[in-house]
Each structure stands twice: as C-alpha cells, then as structure tokens.
C-alpha cells in the first residue's frame, strides 16, 4: 500500500545510467536493437526512455501476442536484446526461445527464463564499464529522421504490422497533443493502466506526462477493483480508459449516488 515516488531529477539520472548500461551492449558497426516484452513497470520505462534519449532503436512488443506473432516481430525488427518482465512475457519468450539467438535481460525471475539470460541488476551495474559515454554528445548524435522506434499492431487479421517512428514524429505528436489539450499541465496527476506497448499508454500518458511536467502513476493492476483502490491513493486528475471501465464506474456511482439529482452537493 506504500506509494513509491520518483522525482524528475531522479528519473533523468536513472535514464542516463540505463543509457550507459545499454552502451556496453554496443559492438562496432553492430548497434543493439532493443525489444521490450513486459508489463508496465519503472525499469521498462527506464529502458524505453534511455533508448529514445540516446538513439538505441527500441521495439515495445504487445503482451497479447501469439507465439507466432512474437517470433515474427523479433525476426522482422531484428531484435538483438530482449528485456523480459512478468509471467506472461516469460511464458511467451520461453515458448519461442529455441528459434532465436537473442540475449535476454530479466526484469525479474531470471531462473525461470530460458536461453542466454542476464539479471537486471547485473545489466544495470555494467554501466560502470561504459567508455566515452558523454550524455550531451550522445543526444546530439541522435538523428531526427532515422527510425527510432517501431510499434506493432495486434495482428488480429494477419501478421502484425510495424509502424515506424522517427524522433521528428515523436516530437510532432507531442506538440499536436498539447495544442489539442491546453488545460493539461504540471498540476495534473495521471493514473495509468493502458499498456505501454500501445500508443495511448506510451505516447499520451507516459510521454505526455513528461512533456507537461505532470505526475505519471502506475496502476497496480488493470482490474476494476484494483483501479478503485488506486484512485483513493493517487487522487488522479486525468484517467484515460477503455469504454468498459467508464461504464463500470458509472454503474457503481449510479448505485451509490442519485446522479439525476439537481443538488450538486449530493454528487
């Protein structure tokens, strides 16, 4: 029930350290391509933001992928290093592992993961081996027009389709969203459960929070009752959701309140 908080200053420090650790994976003429197969968690965000900050191509992979689609994504995007977190991700990877020669970094339970596995703390501690990692220089080298990240559709009708994004795409999306929602700002608190492998969760909630200087709060679970508890702890001003959750909220409130009342105090 304890809330753990991270300031923007601490976040940027952790992103830089993660970038250093990622740079250790580099080989001459063979930059690492990073895959993310995980539930929403801080360490996954650190990897994603470090990749975007320092020019490592990163591919968030839907957790609802089939084995066939996961293999397709890994092969098409040429992932060299896959960060894996959570039971669903571990099961998916273990099922396809024999078909791939990919290095795995385990966010948790490395002993349950098949293949060439490095534990997160080992990966993170390797940042001390980074050579010539100058933060400002690395950022200045990042191309605004090269493919920076690929996001895949669910592949419900055929193989998943990869949508490529450059840094310029990410920036233009960010400013367009901000122009459409000028009321959002640094006083806002997001409660977020939408997956970070989808555009709304990743671009609107996560990167939007950073752009606005708002507070991004990880929901403990997407389950309705769990979200209700998170509402009480976090007191969000912004909550983005699928229609089903709004219907559930309305029905719950309708049971407890007279929503047709003219008395605003009742509501």
Question: Across the structure, where does each feature detected by a protein language model lie?
Answer:
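Conserved structural elements of the adenylate-forming
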Residues: 12-17, 130, 144, 163-183
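Conserved AMP-binding/adenylate-forming
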Residues: 3-5, 19-65, 193
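Conserved AMP-binding A3 loop
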Residues: 5-9, 141, 148-174
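ATP-dependent adenylate-forming carboxylate-activation enzymes
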Residues: 38-39, 56-75, 86-89, 216-234, ...
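Conserved pre-ATP/AMP-binding loop-to-beta segment of ANL
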Residues: 128-152, 159, 183-189
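Conserved AMP-binding/adenylation subdomain of ANL enzymes
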Residues: 171-189, 196-267
């Amino acid at each position: 029930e304890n809330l753990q908080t991270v300031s923007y200053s601490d976040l940027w420090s952790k992103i830089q350290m993660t970038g250093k650790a990622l740079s250790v994976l580099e080989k001459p003429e063979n930059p690492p391509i990073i895959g993310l197969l995980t539930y929403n968690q801080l360490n996954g965000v650190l990897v994603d933001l470090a990749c975007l900050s320092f020019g490592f191509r990163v591919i968030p992979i839907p957790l609802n992928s089939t084995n066939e689609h996961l293999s397709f994504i890994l092969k098409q995007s040429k992932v060299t290093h896959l960060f894996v977190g959570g039971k669903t991700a571990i099961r998916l990877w273990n099922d396809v592992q024999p078909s791939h020669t990919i290095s795995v970094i385990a966010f948790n339970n490395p002993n349950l993961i098949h293949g060439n596995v490095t534990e997160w703390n080992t990966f993170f501690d390797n940042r001390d081996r980074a050579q010539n990692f100058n933060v400002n220089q690395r950022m200045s080298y990042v191309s605004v027009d090269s493919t920076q990240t690929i996001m895949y559709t669910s592949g419900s009708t055929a193989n998943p389709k990869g949508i490529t994004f450059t840094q310029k795409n990410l920036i233009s999306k960010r400013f367009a969203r901000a122009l459409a929602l000028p009321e959002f700002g640094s006083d806002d608190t997001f409660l977020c459960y939408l997956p970070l492998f989808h555009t709304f969760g990743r671009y609107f909630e996560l990167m939007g929070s950073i752009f606005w200087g708002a507070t991004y709060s990880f929901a403990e679970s997407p389950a309705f009752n769990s979200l209700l508890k998170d509402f009480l702890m976090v007191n969000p001003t912004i909550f983005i959701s699928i229609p089903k959750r709004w219907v559930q909220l309305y029905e719950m409130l309708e049971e407890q309140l007279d929503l047709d009342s003219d008395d605003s105090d009742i509501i």
